Structure formats: structure tokens, C-alpha cells
Amino acid sequence: MKLSDIYLELKKGYADSLLYSDLSLLVNIMEYEKDIDVMSIQSLVAGYEKSDTPTITCGIIVYNESKRIKKCLNSVKDDFNEIIVLDSYSTDDTVDIIKCDFPDVEIKYEKWKNDFSYARNKIIEYATSEWIYFIDADNLYSKENKGKIAKVARVLEFFSIDCVVSPYIEEYTGHLYSDTRRMFRLNGKVKFHGKVHEEPMNYNHSLPFNFIVNLKVYHNGYNPSENNIKSKTRRNINLTEEMLRLEPENPKWLFFFGRELHLLDKDEEAIDYLKKSINNYKKFNDQRHFIDALVLLCTLLLQRNNYVDLTLYLDILETEYPRCVDVDYFRSAILLVDMQNKLTSLSNMIDEALTDERYSAINTTKDHFKRILISLNIQLENWERVKEISGEIKNDNMKKEIKQYLANSLHNIEHVLKGIEV
């Protein structure tokens, strides 16, 4: 019986059961295809009531995180059986803060080896629980998660499901990531792979099934107002380059290398690597970062006004991901640029009409042209030109009309600004 069928049967007849409640935390339950042996739904419900909740270790790797470690640990301290911090010999107060405020947290030490997977796998070696969950020091575990992660582990353990678990991670921009792969069973089958942008994989490098779960974590590590993004990116790009040397055809590393080049303001090189990544996805079964590569490439092409290539890759994006609304965003942006170009052409045409020797039967001052020209330049946000043209108008009534229009616009803008909270 499929897990999704079990869920639907529970919803129909046992919606008040603990099993249904805990299964409801699995967001993409309909995607799990493996069959599960079931005697009866009633026996499942009864068996789950008697089942044990597995223990969970929370693992954190740190180096000089004195500004953030307290908030991070406070957010997780009550939801896990064991917390292990692996410190790479911090030179700030990170360790002192942990020892003083979190005496139950186990601290291990390991020199930094330029390999995030090595550090995470070390924590796996130290962990004594049945499951492990990883959080970063720049993450906050939502208060709304209280007790949920144990329920997730319990229900997956009950059905003997081997998988990785992904909470939602909310970025400082508000964007939610769902493919985050933070928790898995400690049965020796899963280890981290990759010196950077690491992820848990099976021992044969295949990808475990990924369950998205209804938990939320907040990530602030890439907020430019609070972090040195360039420094972090320079560290990452060196490690990504090492992974590229090891796996030169892997589109994942080509994508991340391109993304990091972009963050270092090297967009021409970034575009080349993103194109290589997209091309290589044709040869790989793992398509997870395909959409990310396409969207970033389209963004860079739009910024550089390369509409020929943008249209080409937009077609690929629309074909591969027909439900991705960003296709409409990019096509709207292209139309907006086209409209702005047409407005500019119209403005230039009127400028010529103002300076040539043809006469006007409407008004020999040609102020009526200037009225249109002002409207065009307001839309183009060419304010110096608006000021210049306004000074050339001879009709006082038209000047008053324009001044009132601008005053009303300013009033409306100020009203909007008051409603924007930052």
C-alpha cells in the first residue's frame, strides 16, 4: 500500500488519530512511491500509539560565531536529545558562550580542513542518537516547530522509511527553500558529500528520497546588511573550484561556480559557466539545480540587455518548468523594456517636432507637444528633462496644470511611502 493511500484512508476514517496528525507534517507525501506492508489501517493506528519516539542529535559546525551562536542554540535547546557543536578552534568568545549558557551542549574540536562535509561527517561519528538534524549558526529554528521534529522522526521510523528530511528555510528576502536536506536516520547509509554546498547522500552517491516537512528555519547568513558576502563567497568559490576539478562535468558545481562568480561581480564569466551547467543537465538524472541555473542566467541576461539569448533560455525554462511563474516575470520585463524604448522613441520624435520649421494650427507655441513630452519623461523618470521642458512652456494655465499634477503625484508618493515599513 502506498503511503499516500494510507494517509487518505486515515483522513477519511481516523482524522483524530496521532498517526494522521504526524503524517500530516510530511508535505510531499504523495510523491513517495514505495509500497508499505499493511495489515489494516486500524492496526496501524493502534501500533503507532505504542511506538517509540526516536532520539535526535542536533549538530552545528562553528568558527567565530559569538554574535549568533546564542540565538541559534536557544532556538534548538529544548527540541533535541543531544546537541553537538564542532568548533574549528574559534578565536572569539564562541566556546565561552556555549560553556557558560549551554552547559549540556557537547563541544568537540577539529581543525578546519576546507571541507564542510568532513566537519559534518565528524559530528555524525560523535552522535549517539538514532537520527541527526543539522542546523547552521546563522539559522534560527522557529518556535512554531516545538515538538514537531520528534513527530517527523517517529512517523518515518514507524514506517521504516529511509530518506532525508527538509524543513522550509526562509531567507532574509522572504524566499522559502524546500530542498534543504537537514535530517536523516543514523544507520550508516548516509554521509555528506562535497567540500561546499554539501548534501547528504547514500554511500553509493545516490540521492535518498527527500521528504519536505512542515517545519520552518530562518536563515540570515546572506543578508548583505549583516554579513560580509564577498568574503564568504571567496571562501566558497575556492572550494567549489576544487569540486569542479574532481567532478568537472557535474552541472551542480558549474552552477554554484557561476553563481559565486556573479556574487563577485564577474558576470561575463558567470554566464559562461551557467550555460555550461544548463547544457550538462541534459546528461544528468539529478536535475535539482537546473531551474536555479536557468533563472540566474535569465536574470543576468536581462540585466545585460541580451534579449536574444534571454528569449532562447526562457523557452527552455518554460518547456522544462511550465508551472514556473518566473517565465511571466521575464517576459513582462522584456515587454517593459520594449515599452520604455518606444516611449523614448516617441519622446525623441516630439523633440524633433519642437525644433523643426513646421507650423502648428493648434498652438504656434507648440506647448501642447511639451505637455505630452512632460508626461513621457515623467514615465521615463527623466526629471531633469521634465524641469527643462516645464520652464519652456509659455502658457501660464498649462504651467499651473502641470505644477498641480506634479504636486498631486508628490502627495500620492508621500502617502505610499508612509505605508512602507522597513
Swiss-Prot record:
Keywords, ordered alphabetically? Glycosyltransferase, Transferase
Q: Which GO MF terms does the UniProt record name?
A: glycosyltransferase activity; UDP-glycosyltransferase activity
Q: Name one Pfam family in it.
A: Glycos_transf_2
Source organism, top-level taxon: Bacteria
Q: What is its EC number?
A: 2.4.1.-
A biological process (GO) annotation for this entry?
bacteriocin biosynthetic process
Its biological purpose: Transfers a hexose moiety onto 'Cys-41' of bacteriocin sublancin-168 (SunA). Accepts UDP-glucose (UDP-Glc), UDP-N-acetylglucosamine (UDP-GlcNAc), UDP-galactose (UDP-Gal), UDP-xylose (UDP-Xyl) and GDP-mannose as substrate.
UniProt-listed PANTHER family = GLYCOSYLTRANSFERASE, POLY-BETA-1,6-N-ACETYL-D-GLUCOSAMINE SYNTHASE
Q: Which family does it belong to?
A: Belongs to the glycosyltransferase 2 family.
Kindly provide the name given to this protein in its UniProt entry: SPbeta prophage-derived glycosyltransferase SunS
- According to its UniProt entry, this protein's organism is Bacillus subtilis (strain 168)
Record gene name: sunS
